[in-house]
Design a protein with these regions (language model features):
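Glycine-rich, proline-tolerant flexible connector loops at the mouths of alpha/beta enzymes
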Residues: 33-57
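Short alpha-helix boundary/capping motifs
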Residues: 12, 50, 77, 88, ...
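Conserved beta-strand positions in the central sheet of alpha/beta enzyme cores
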Residues: 31, 69-71, 107, 144, ...
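Histidine-acidic metal/acid-base catalytic patches
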Residues: 1-29, 61, 102, 155, ...
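Surface-exposed, active-site-proximal loop segments in enzymatic domains
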Residues: 38-47, 72-90, 110-123, 224-231, ...
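Active-site acidic/histidine proton-transfer and metal-coordination neighborhood
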Residues: 17, 54, 58-63, 76-180, ...
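N-terminal glycine-rich cofactor-binding segment that shapes the pocket for flavin-like pterin cofactors
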Residues: 65-67
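Active-site-proximal loop/turn and secondary-structure-junction residues that shape catalytic pockets
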Residues: 9-11, 34-36, 73-76, 110-114, ...
């Protein structure tokens, strides 16, 4: 197992600067975020131009860094056709670029029509996702689903794949061996779901793992209740309430021995490049205590 990170938090640096810093600090893996504000490579150019793909691969080799996945959540089931089609097109660009770069997986969301209940979205999964998975299978890429509810569309969110019962249904609809999870315990913690039990049950479907913590603010919860806002926040691993020793041991138990990517969304350790980098290094040192 190796500790890496998602590069979105270092968006102000160039791609080579990110790689150089990562090498200097002992990171071996990066999850490459592909949102417009964070994207460091031209996905379509990489996918269609062998010279550009080779240039990126040479840069990675120079700094001895491996890309664990190309990442963007996406709104693949959005009720607005333009947003939905653009999201699905970006997914395909990630898949094609991942194939050109020999990156094993892409990370994304299932998506959600936030105007509908979760169960009503299963019909949309059946409508849109088989073709998306065929594209991934044609390119030999794994698809790792993030389990974040994405509450930007409060209170329903725009990703239905946030709970074990939904994963069960999605994997039933889409029985591809190339569809799995990018497992992040932080979301399950604040949702009140036993993340260790979920990890054990779906261990064979864990393609990647993300390291983000959550902190429950009990004083605020007592005032706002579960349907209120501001009673939890994301933290760096080691600063919230996830039991990381138990989580990483369970990853080993279920047979996972790949990268664990720190996702830096900690409001306490933001505000400057120096704070972000020190936050990453804190969690790297903390998590490495559990890696053997």
């Amino acid at each position: 197992m190796r500790i890496g990170f998602i590069n979105a938090c270092l968006a102000e640096l160039t791609f080579e600067e990110q790689l150089r810093w990562s090498q200097e600090k002992g990171f071996k893996d990066i999850e490459l975020h592909t949102a417009p504000r964070t994207l460091k490579i031209d996905l379509q150019k990489v996918a269609t131009n062998r010279g550009e793909a080779d240039r990126i691969k040479d840069l990675l080799a120079k700094y001895d860094i491996k890309l664990s996945s190309l990442l963007l959540g996406g709104q693949h089931l959005h009720p607005d056709p333009q947003k939905r089609q653009a999201s699905q097109a970006h997914f395909k660009n990630m898949v094609a670029a991942a194939a050109a770069l020999d990156v094993a997986a892409v990370t994304t969301f299932i998506g959600r029509d936030h105007t509908l209940p979760v169960k009503a979205n299963f019909a949309l999964v059946k409508k849109y996702w088989p073709e998306m998975m065929r594209y991934a299978e044609e390119h030999g890429r794994k698809v790792a689903i993030e389990n974040c509810p994405m509450l930007d569309e409060w209170p329903s969110g725009y990703n239905i794949a946030f709970a074990p019962e939904v994963w069960e249904e999605v994997f039933s609809i889409l029985p591809s061996p190339l569809l799995g999870l990018n497992f992040d315990p932080s979301h399950l913690l604040w949702l009140g779901i036993d993340y260790i039990a979920a990890l054990k049950k779906f261990g064979s479907k864990v393609f990647l793992a993300q390291a983000k913590d959550s902190e429950i603010l009990k004083d605020r919860l007592d005032q706002a209740g579960f349907l209120g806002e501001g009673w939890w926040r994301y933290r760096l691993p080691g600063l919230g309430q996830v039991d990381w020793g138990k989580f990483i041991n369970t990853l080993y138990e279920v047979g996972y021995d790949g990268p664990v990517s720190i996702e830096h969304e900690d409001p306490i350790w933001e505000g400057s490049l120096d704070k972000v980098q020190r936050g990453l290094l804190f969690s790297q040192q903390y998590l490495n205590r559990f890696i053997v």
